[in-house]
Amino acid sequence: MSEVQILLLLLLSGYLISVSLGMVIIPRILVISHKKRLYDVPDSRKVHTTPVPRLGGLSFFPVVLMSFALVIGFRLYLWPSDLSSFSIEMLHEYLFLFVGMTLLYLVGFCDDLVGVGYRYKFIVQVVSALLLVLSGNWLDTLGGLFGIYSVPALLGVPVTVFAVVYVTNAINLIDGIDGLASGLCCIALSVLSVFFLDRKSVV
Protein backbone atom coordinates (compact mmCIF):
# COMPACT_ATOMS: atom_id res chain seq x y z
CA MET A 1 0.00 0.00 0.00
CA SER A 2 1.16 3.53 -0.71
CA GLU A 3 1.67 5.97 2.15
CA VAL A 4 -1.40 7.97 1.12
CA GLN A 5 -3.53 4.81 1.17
CA ILE A 6 -2.18 3.92 4.61
CA LEU A 7 -3.02 7.39 5.94
CA LEU A 8 -6.53 7.24 4.48
CA LEU A 9 -7.04 3.83 6.07
CA LEU A 10 -5.82 5.11 9.44
CA LEU A 11 -8.03 8.22 9.29
CA LEU A 12 -11.05 6.09 8.41
CA SER A 13 -10.17 3.61 11.15
CA GLY A 14 -9.87 6.40 13.72
CA TYR A 15 -13.25 7.77 12.69
CA LEU A 16 -14.97 4.37 12.87
CA ILE A 17 -13.36 3.55 16.22
CA SER A 18 -14.48 6.89 17.68
CA VAL A 19 -18.04 6.50 16.44
CA SER A 20 -18.26 2.91 17.68
CA LEU A 21 -16.91 3.74 21.13
CA GLY A 22 -19.20 6.76 21.39
CA MET A 23 -22.24 4.67 20.49
CA VAL A 24 -21.35 2.20 23.23
CA ILE A 25 -20.34 4.63 25.99
CA ILE A 26 -22.70 7.60 25.66
CA PRO A 27 -26.00 5.71 26.22
CA ARG A 28 -24.59 4.24 29.43
CA ILE A 29 -23.47 7.66 30.64
CA LEU A 30 -26.95 9.02 29.95
CA VAL A 31 -28.47 6.25 32.06
CA ILE A 32 -26.27 7.35 34.97
CA SER A 33 -27.24 11.00 34.39
CA HIS A 34 -30.93 10.13 34.57
CA LYS A 35 -30.50 7.99 37.67
CA LYS A 36 -28.51 10.68 39.49
CA ARG A 37 -30.67 13.47 38.03
CA LEU A 38 -27.65 15.30 36.62
CA TYR A 39 -29.43 17.67 34.27
CA ASP A 40 -28.60 20.84 32.37
CA VAL A 41 -31.39 23.21 33.38
CA PRO A 42 -32.63 25.62 30.64
CA ASP A 43 -31.71 29.30 30.89
CA SER A 44 -31.59 32.36 28.63
CA ARG A 45 -28.47 31.13 26.77
CA LYS A 46 -29.86 27.70 25.89
CA VAL A 47 -32.42 26.62 23.34
CA HIS A 48 -33.75 23.51 25.06
CA THR A 49 -36.87 24.02 27.16
CA THR A 50 -36.66 20.90 29.33
CA PRO A 51 -33.75 19.62 31.46
CA VAL A 52 -31.32 17.38 29.54
CA PRO A 53 -28.55 15.08 30.83
CA ARG A 54 -25.26 16.96 31.26
CA LEU A 55 -22.64 14.20 31.18
CA GLY A 56 -22.77 13.29 27.49
CA GLY A 57 -19.46 15.08 26.93
CA LEU A 58 -17.82 12.88 29.55
CA SER A 59 -17.05 10.31 26.87
CA PHE A 60 -15.32 12.61 24.38
CA PHE A 61 -11.78 12.77 25.72
CA PRO A 62 -11.49 9.05 26.64
CA VAL A 63 -12.83 8.16 23.18
CA VAL A 64 -10.33 10.48 21.48
CA LEU A 65 -7.49 9.10 23.61
CA MET A 66 -8.39 5.46 22.95
CA SER A 67 -8.88 6.05 19.22
CA PHE A 68 -5.57 7.88 18.96
CA ALA A 69 -3.72 5.14 20.86
CA LEU A 70 -5.27 2.37 18.76
CA VAL A 71 -4.53 4.12 15.45
CA ILE A 72 -0.91 4.80 16.42
CA GLY A 73 -0.59 1.24 17.74
CA PHE A 74 -1.90 -0.25 14.49
CA ARG A 75 0.41 2.08 12.54
CA LEU A 76 3.48 0.87 14.42
CA TYR A 77 2.41 -2.78 14.42
CA LEU A 78 1.31 -3.20 10.80
CA TRP A 79 3.82 -0.92 9.07
CA PRO A 80 6.91 -0.81 11.34
CA SER A 81 9.29 -0.24 8.44
CA ASP A 82 7.56 2.91 7.22
CA LEU A 83 7.44 5.39 10.08
CA SER A 84 8.05 8.66 8.25
CA SER A 85 5.01 10.23 9.93
CA PHE A 86 5.85 9.11 13.45
CA SER A 87 9.02 8.90 15.51
CA ILE A 88 9.85 8.30 19.16
CA GLU A 89 11.18 11.87 19.31
CA MET A 90 7.57 13.06 18.98
CA LEU A 91 6.54 11.21 22.14
CA HIS A 92 7.23 14.15 24.47
CA GLU A 93 4.97 16.32 22.31
CA TYR A 94 2.07 13.94 22.82
CA LEU A 95 2.74 13.60 26.54
CA PHE A 96 2.60 17.36 27.17
CA LEU A 97 -0.42 17.65 24.89
CA PHE A 98 -2.35 14.89 26.65
CA VAL A 99 -1.58 16.30 30.11
CA GLY A 100 -3.00 19.65 29.01
CA MET A 101 -6.06 17.99 27.49
CA THR A 102 -6.57 15.94 30.65
CA LEU A 103 -6.54 19.09 32.80
CA LEU A 104 -9.18 20.72 30.61
CA TYR A 105 -11.24 17.53 30.64
CA LEU A 106 -11.17 17.22 34.43
CA VAL A 107 -12.12 20.87 34.95
CA GLY A 108 -14.98 20.51 32.48
CA PHE A 109 -16.16 17.38 34.26
CA CYS A 110 -16.07 19.09 37.65
CA ASP A 111 -17.84 22.11 36.19
CA ASP A 112 -20.67 19.88 34.96
CA LEU A 113 -21.03 18.24 38.36
CA VAL A 114 -20.56 21.00 40.92
CA GLY A 115 -19.55 24.13 39.02
CA VAL A 116 -16.07 25.68 38.83
CA GLY A 117 -15.29 29.38 39.25
CA TYR A 118 -14.17 31.26 36.16
CA ARG A 119 -10.81 32.15 37.77
CA TYR A 120 -9.90 28.50 38.29
CA LYS A 121 -11.03 27.61 34.78
CA PHE A 122 -8.96 30.44 33.33
CA ILE A 123 -5.84 29.33 35.24
CA VAL A 124 -6.23 25.74 34.02
CA GLN A 125 -6.75 26.95 30.45
CA VAL A 126 -3.54 29.00 30.57
CA VAL A 127 -1.59 26.08 32.08
CA SER A 128 -2.93 23.76 29.37
CA ALA A 129 -1.93 26.25 26.69
CA LEU A 130 1.58 26.51 28.17
CA LEU A 131 1.86 22.71 28.11
CA LEU A 132 1.00 22.85 24.41
CA VAL A 133 3.84 25.34 23.95
CA LEU A 134 6.21 23.07 25.92
CA SER A 135 5.37 20.26 23.50
CA GLY A 136 6.92 22.39 20.77
CA ASN A 137 3.62 23.31 19.12
CA TRP A 138 3.34 27.08 18.93
CA LEU A 139 2.87 29.67 16.22
CA ASP A 140 6.38 29.98 14.76
CA THR A 141 5.40 30.74 11.16
CA LEU A 142 2.53 32.14 9.10
CA GLY A 143 3.57 30.09 6.08
CA GLY A 144 4.09 33.17 3.93
CA LEU A 145 0.81 34.87 4.83
CA PHE A 146 1.34 38.66 4.60
CA GLY A 147 4.91 37.79 3.60
CA ILE A 148 5.69 36.44 7.09
CA TYR A 149 7.56 33.13 7.23
CA SER A 150 9.09 33.26 10.70
CA VAL A 151 7.50 34.38 13.98
CA PRO A 152 9.81 34.99 16.97
CA ALA A 153 9.09 33.09 20.18
CA LEU A 154 8.48 36.32 22.12
CA LEU A 155 5.47 36.92 19.87
CA GLY A 156 4.48 33.39 18.85
CA VAL A 157 4.22 31.92 22.35
CA PRO A 158 1.86 34.59 23.81
CA VAL A 159 -0.26 34.50 20.65
CA THR A 160 -0.52 30.70 20.91
CA VAL A 161 -1.56 30.84 24.58
CA PHE A 162 -4.12 33.55 23.80
CA ALA A 163 -5.52 31.57 20.85
CA VAL A 164 -5.91 28.38 22.89
CA VAL A 165 -7.67 30.17 25.76
CA TYR A 166 -9.83 32.17 23.34
CA VAL A 167 -10.98 29.15 21.31
CA THR A 168 -11.60 27.09 24.46
CA ASN A 169 -13.92 29.76 25.86
CA ALA A 170 -15.56 30.38 22.48
CA ILE A 171 -16.48 26.69 22.16
CA ASN A 172 -17.75 26.70 25.73
CA LEU A 173 -19.97 29.72 25.01
CA ILE A 174 -21.60 28.28 21.87
CA ASP A 175 -22.08 24.88 23.50
CA GLY A 176 -25.49 26.01 24.77
CA ILE A 177 -27.05 25.40 21.32
CA ASP A 178 -27.44 21.72 20.46
CA GLY A 179 -25.08 20.62 17.71
CA LEU A 180 -23.48 24.02 17.09
CA ALA A 181 -20.19 23.43 18.93
CA SER A 182 -19.85 19.84 17.70
CA GLY A 183 -20.71 20.86 14.14
CA LEU A 184 -18.10 23.63 14.06
CA CYS A 185 -15.50 21.30 15.57
CA CYS A 186 -16.27 18.63 12.96
CA ILE A 187 -15.79 21.18 10.17
CA ALA A 188 -12.51 22.39 11.67
CA LEU A 189 -11.20 18.85 12.20
CA SER A 190 -12.20 17.86 8.66
CA VAL A 191 -10.16 20.76 7.27
CA LEU A 192 -7.22 19.80 9.50
CA SER A 193 -7.50 16.19 8.30
CA VAL A 194 -7.13 17.37 4.70
CA PHE A 195 -4.01 19.36 5.64
CA PHE A 196 -2.53 16.41 7.54
CA LEU A 197 -3.25 14.10 4.62
CA ASP A 198 -1.62 16.54 2.22
CA ARG A 199 1.48 16.59 4.44
CA LYS A 200 1.34 12.78 4.78
CA SER A 201 1.07 13.06 8.56
CA VAL A 202 -1.08 10.62 10.52
CA VAL A 203 -1.61 13.10 13.39
Where are these regions (language model features)?
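"…together with the soluble PPM/PP2C metallo-phosphatase catalytic core" -> "…together
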Residues: 2-203
